[in-house]
Amino acid sequence: MSTPTPKVGFVSLGCPKALVDSERILTQLRMEGYEVVPTYEDADVVVVNTCGFIDSAKAESLEVIGEAIAENGKVIVTGCMGVEEHTIRDVHPSVLAVTGPQQYEQVVTAVHEVVPPKTEHNPLVDLVPPQGVKLTPRHYAYLKISEGCNHSCSFCIIPSMRGKLVSRPVGDVLSEAERLVKAGVKELLVISQDTSAYGVDLKYKTDFWNGQPVKTRMKELCEALSSMGVWVRLHYVYPYPNVDDVIPLMAAGKLLPYLDIPFQHASPKVLKAMKRPAFEDKTLARIKQWREICPELTIRSTFIVGFPGETEEDFQYLLDWLTEAQLDRVGCFQYSPVEGAPANELGLEPVPDEVKQDRWERFMAHQQAISAARLQLKVGKEIEVLIDEVDEQGAVGRSWADAPEIDGNVFVDSDELKPGDKVRVRITDADEYDLWAELV
């Protein structure tokens, strides 16, 4: 008589990099015959992959762990907040195991201890696709090229959670990308903590892919990915000089003309306190040069307002810089002290919460006007759109300017499309974030 198939519940919190970690754990569990179920009550054990980047993320992680314990009782915790095991166990002493990020084998071992895998052959194993388990829609996937970061930004604790930069061999990355494309993926989203630094730790070592030598470096990786005939989108690009090397690839249509490049601030004084590159004038000149080479370039960035020591003059400098930069997509966060971050020891004057809120609102209104004006320029133009979903009201897609989850959408007036379709459309309307279009 066969034993019941062991069942695992899984909750993945945080950024796309954590999502890739979840995919890796789930792939291993599926390979061992575990069934992944969508509810707490149907699971033999629940794994929660946490986020620990800022206090609100930690609070959400603790809340979800509590829900899983209440609904199921058997909970294993992993991910970035796992480095603070004492905090987790203080709030939830009944968790069965706590592991940090990237500790895939420890998670799987902890699952084994609660509910062992079946010893006889499980037909579920035969259903695991060659590209592994993916938590994204079939037509796009995140491609993680490295782990960790060599920077010491004073507001950030990622190096203490995920360690120094460790780049994946470029041959492994390209082989994974190839499997994804063969499985029907039409957009590869390249992610890491620092995409620009890819290969630095390996001294840009030459690896091999399909018998051909390829250097472990961002430009060469992008050139190889561009040969696969799918959209390739770069995320988390630190503003190193070598970013200039990939702009011509975008202009030539080999990469999506899209840069996700976190500038964080513009005031030289604030950037210095953040331990970020403080060359804001040169950055403006580079942005201008990038757009001269690739006029279609979309630039997304993130900023922090209310960093300790930020004055009204610093903030106004940032707004003026935004006016000059004319960025397309921008996210903004109010500074929140993070336990263990070097910024806590700088001795700078904290910005009051009400001032942070006021600056955030002014920042968002200022940038919203810029984004709306830039989107308005697209009305009447024809663009290619990748469809994400379709319902009775029409299709929802994205252009080269729109990454999933964080950017806007293109609403297409058609119910004849399906997710994964690439279509030409004409833009008919725009607001601050989204576009409306008709099929060409």
Swiss-Prot record:
It comes from the Bacteria. Keywords: 4Fe-4S, Cytoplasm, Iron, Iron-sulfur, Metal-binding, S-adenosyl-L-methionine, Transferase. It is an enzyme of class 2 (transferase). Its main location: cytoplasm. One of its GO terms (cellular component) is cytosol. It is found in: Cytoplasm. One of its GO terms (molecular function) is aspartic acid methylthiotransferase activity. It catalyses: L-aspartate(89)-[ribosomal protein uS12]-hydrogen + (sulfur carrier)-SH + AH2 + 2 S-adenosyl-L-methionine = 3-methylsulfanyl-L-aspartate(89)-[ribosomal protein uS12]-hydrogen + (sulfur carrier)-H + 5'-deoxyadenosine + L-methionine + A + S-adenosyl-L-homocysteine + 2 H(+). Residues 6-116 form the MTTase N-terminal domain. GO terms for biological process: tRNA modification. It holds the Pfam family TRAM_2. Its cofactor is [4Fe-4S] cluster. PROSITE patterns: MTTASE_N, MTTASE_RADICAL, RADICAL_SAM, TRAM. [4Fe-4S] cluster 2 binds at C149, C153, C156. InterPro entries: Elp3/MiaA/NifB-like_rSAM, Methylthiotransferase, Methylthiotransferase_CS, Methylthiotransferase_N, Methylthiotransferase_N_sf, NA-bd_OB-fold, Ribosomal_uS12_MeSTrfase_RimO, rSAM. [4Fe-4S] cluster 1 binds at C15, C51, C80. Residues 376-440 form the TRAM domain. Gene3D superfamilies: Methylthiotransferase, N-terminal domain (3.40.50.12160), Nucleic acid-binding proteins (2.40.50.140), tm_1862 like domain (3.80.30.20). Binds 2 [4Fe-4S] clusters. One cluster is coordinated with 3 cysteines and an exchangeable S-adenosyl-L-methionine. Residues 135-373 form the Radical SAM core domain. Its EC number is 2.8.4.4. SMART domains: Elp3. Belongs to the methylthiotransferase family. RimO subfamily. This is Ribosomal protein uS12 methylthiotransferase RimO. It comes from Pseudomonas aeruginosa (strain UCBPP-PA14). The lineage of its organism: Bacteria, Pseudomonadati, Pseudomonadota, Gammaproteobacteria, Pseudomonadales.
